[in-house]
Amino acid sequence: MFNDIPVFDYEDIQLIPNKCIITSRSQADTSVTLGKYQFKLPVIPANMQTIIDETIAEQLAKEGYFYIMHRFDEDSRKPFIKRMHEQGLIASISVGVKACEYEFVTSLKEDAPEFITIDIAHGHANSVIDMIKHIKTELPETFVIAGNVGTPEAVRELENAGADATKVGIGPGKVCITKVKTGFGTGGWQLAALRWCAKAARKPIIADGGIRTHGDIAKSIRFGASMVMIGSLFAGHIESPGKTVEVDGETFKEYYGSASEYQKGEHKNVEGKKILLPTKGHLSDTLTEMQQDLQSSISYAGGKDLDSLRHVDYVIVKNSIWNGDSI
């Protein structure tokens, strides 16, 4: 069955323009609804320690962007929820599937977050299904995102368990080496995997990993994503939590994977690596540029909002769109 589907990735695809119907690109609406809430952009900074911290989460929430706080400072999550709610902001946190997480979820009944993401590398697992059911029993009003997965069967099974959205992508990220360490994943065919999974989905899909350019956001939406999680494009900012390093007079920021030894604190079951990215200005500037580029994408799609991107034609060009050039 699988061998019948076309296999391609972001660099293999070009979207085909339609007649523009807006007089200014600024008229294009990039907003998206997830659950009961509307957000400015269909993008989510990856819930990784070198991408997001509580300060950035607060900034994003205040400015109308969606965020997911990482799960690697377990004791701070409950105070974080309280602090966000005291400011009238949404609380969006991550959990794992260890036994202690069940107690933690139950403890949130009096002050439930609006969003919980179940965040493990291989999300098509009984442990994830059990956690979905537990959250939905204890916190029925909380929107549950579950992942990560890479097949339609996984999407359907997590949806049937009660997940409100699923996160698609196993190993395509810049600092993820799952595909090399295990031989498994969606690296090299992430966009095709997204398309495959989205065709089976009844609820929102979040594309996670493999985004290298702003145009890849539009391509993700074309192939079925409601939201797009991005790591490397959000790493390396002045505000980024990653450690600042100076090399030959230039400043860089550390960026490492959630399954790396740098996050784990030990060299065990490592599926991530660390890289240095040149410091690239403020996060707000990147978000503004993303919005402007997405507005341009909507204008090329011949529409007024994100939905227009879902219906454009495309061609598969097999790695030739750069013509040998790099960005």
From Swiss-Prot:
Keywords: NADP, Oxidoreductase
Enzyme kind, highest EC tier: oxidoreductase
Family annotation (Pfam families): IMPDH (PF00478)
Binding residues for NADP(+): 205-228
EC number of the protein: 1.7.1.7
Catalytic site positions: C176 (thioimidate intermediate)
Coiled coil: none
HAMAP family: GMP_reduct_type2 (MF_01511)
PANTHER family registered for this protein in UniProt: GMP REDUCTASE (PTHR43170:SF5)
Name of the protein: GMP reductase
Organism: Streptococcus pyogenes serotype M3 (strain ATCC BAA-595 / MGAS315)
Gene of this entry: guaC
